[in-house]
Regions:
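Short beta-rich binding modules
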Residues: 2-340
Length: 340
């Protein structure tokens, strides 16, 4: 997909923002969308956001064959050298929900390398919302926009961050992996499934991380739910979205949509940067390659208020973006689809 190249002059300042009644805004969205129960909607991928190289949680595995009857202490003693070398993080109990009743089982936890991760956002043009009234802006209905990955409050950081990251991990998908190499995002990964559903590739073909921008503008089916979780006398707004598959034959793809690609080390569209939600910015800040990146510099110019700073006017030139990734080969731990 070709991106337009334009020059954009952007003036920003630490001006006072309008006070937003988020309770009223959330009530409005829930009522207007009408998806308190999960519903299938056609949506178009309009944005891909590079979250940088993120530290991932330990991978969880079954204990090795022959170790099933050992206790945690016995496993720690047997693999003391591997634990000291950092090849194994720990052995610990986890709840096995596949049994009835659920039972505690011992799992092996192994460190994962930092990996480049992304998120993406989807517009649903069949659901138009006019949020201007809540932000002191002119009336301008826009499609419902949802971001993959959900969000949660990180107690240590004291801020909201992305809950489910999409790591760009490669697997050897050759039919004879011992003798041949065919590197690709894992066929079980969400991004590979999207590529097949949107007919970018056929089943069994490779889909590489530097191809993910080809998903921009593609119309697919998603499961959507927007509502409130009630706890005591309080209610908490939530948005859920997960990829389902290709659209039905009778449906037409959405056309003439504006798309954007945000990357860590490229010039990005200032207008797109202004629209990124705060939990995505918070997650970008956690990336090991965020400090000193081109993206950090641009965000400090375009959105200084999001980082506690100020900025004078800045002129940013948009260039044609290309998906630039640093994939790490892996034969395991594919990212599964999350109902996030």
């Amino acid at each position: 997909m070709a991106f337009k190249t334009t020059s954009v002059a952007t003036t920003t300042s630490a001006s006072t923002k309008p006070t937003v009644d988020f309770d009223a805004l959330n009530d409005f969205v829930v009522e207007q969308v009408g998806c308190q129960q999960p519903e299938t909607l056609n949506g178009v991928i309009v944005g891909i956001i590079d979250l940088g190289n993120q530290k991932l949680p330990d991978a969880e595995y079954d204990v090795d064959s022959g170790d099933e009857d050992l206790s945690v202490e016995e496993l720690e003693a047997k693999y003391a050298d591997e634990i000291e070398a950092g090849k194994i993080s720990k052995f610990d109990f986890v709840k096995d929900w596949s049994t009835r009743p659920p039972k505690d089982v011992i799992k092996k936890f192994v460190p994962q390398k930092d990996r480049q991760c992304i998120s993406y956002c989807v517009d649903f043009p069949d659901v138009m919302l006019d949020k201007g009234q809540f932000f002191g802006e002119n009336s301008e209905p826009k499609p419902l926009r949802l971001y993959f990955g959900g969000q949660y409050y990180h107690q240590g950081l004291k801020k909201m961050i992305v809950q489910n990251l999409l790591p760009l991990k490669l697997s050897n998908i050759a039919k004879d992996p011992r003798n041949d190499k065919l590197w690709s995002l894992n066929p079980k990964s969400q991004l590979h499934k999207m590529a097949v559903a949107s007919k970018i590739i056929n089943t069994g073909e490779a889909f590489l991380p530097d191809q993910i921008d080809e998903l921009l503008g593609k119309t697919l089916q998603f499961k959507v739910q927007i509502g409130f979780n009630e706890k005591g006398d309080k209610k908490y707004y939530f948005e859920k979205m997960s990829f389902l598959g290709a659209i039905q034959r009778k449906d037409k793809p959405f056309e003439n949509v504006d798309v954007f690609l945000i990357q860590m080390d490229d010039e990005n569209d200032p207008e797109a940067l202004k629209q990124i939600r705060k939990h995505l910015l918070n997650t970008m800040e956690m990336a090991t390659n965020f400090e000193g990146s081109a993206l950090q510099k641009q965000l400090l110019e375009v959105r200084p208020q999001s980082f506690g700073g100020t900025s004078s006017s800045a002129v940013v030139k948009k260039e044609t973006p290309k998906a630039v990734v640093e994939p790490v080969a892996s034969d395991s731990n594919e990212d599964d689809d999350d109902w996030s």
